[in-house]
């Protein structure tokens, strides 16, 4: 009998709990739910296992406060850290969450050095860099959840604008996972037709698309302002699951993620959101899009923002 993959979730808050539920429903593997708060991962694990009996899932879920339980993990998703709250930007979280990420990285290095690691903790582009450098894992096995989520928001707003199914929309968002991200209308389509062509057909306007791009950039902040006590968790969890599944099932799927760049897009030694192919080796290839001068300028501005943020912790 084939052994289930072992998936460890570091952080058992809203995203961690949602991740565990989705993994169980999709039967992706057995789960270790870790948190420093005593009782929280254990309680959620028991609740989720009981929910699994209704769904007919035999996935095993263990709640723990001991890092040793992540030993031998095939994949790890990290959500540990302070979430955003109203008035707090992703960047304000940097000093506290850097300390948390360093501790997580040490334990990943110790107990699961062969794992594929997905980081969700904000500020994302810096946290995933810290994970890489502190853990010593190969860069193709450490990525950040960014573009899949940003594209999902762009997809929704475009579907609403054109009054079509979200399944007809395919969008691309590059750059840092922050307010300077770069939603690319030229590389976004409705049933294969690029957005600029649809504008020429009179189905929308440049003004409307610019509003949608601005809303996409502030997508996380919009939810933080509405919730008042936290940040988004359903969509971030669903985005990470898509990345996890591409790895576990060797799908060789193109997804936009925060990936480590070594010259691609003219960027070195930095994590930035770009399209990558994900399969059983982790990051198989970085896909380099041909950008116009204007698009490249926006991308470079976003990259500069990531660099400045990273400089504050170096």
Swiss-Prot record:
Q: Where does substrate bind?
A: 84, 90, 122, 153
- Methyltransferase: is it a keyword of this entry? no
Q: What is its EC number?
A: 1.1.1.37
Instruction: Please give the catalytic activity noted in the UniProt record.
Output: (S)-malate + NAD(+) = oxaloacetate + NADH + H(+)
Its BP terms in the Gene Ontology are:
lactate metabolic process; tricarboxylic acid cycle
Domain of life according to the entry: Bacteria
| UniProt GO molecular function | L-lactate dehydrogenase activity; L-malate dehydrogenase (NAD+) activity
Catalytic center residues? 177 (proton acceptor)
Instruction: Provide the alphabetized UniProt keywords.
Output: NAD, Oxidoreductase, Tricarboxylic acid cycle
Q: Where does NAD(+) bind?
A: 11-16, 35, 97, 120-122
Family the entry assigns: Belongs to the LDH/MDH superfamily. MDH type 3 family.
Purpose of the protein? Catalyzes the reversible oxidation of malate to oxaloacetate.
The name under which this protein is listed is Malate dehydrogenase
Species per Swiss-Prot/TrEMBL record = Rickettsia felis (strain ATCC VR-1525 / URRWXCal2)
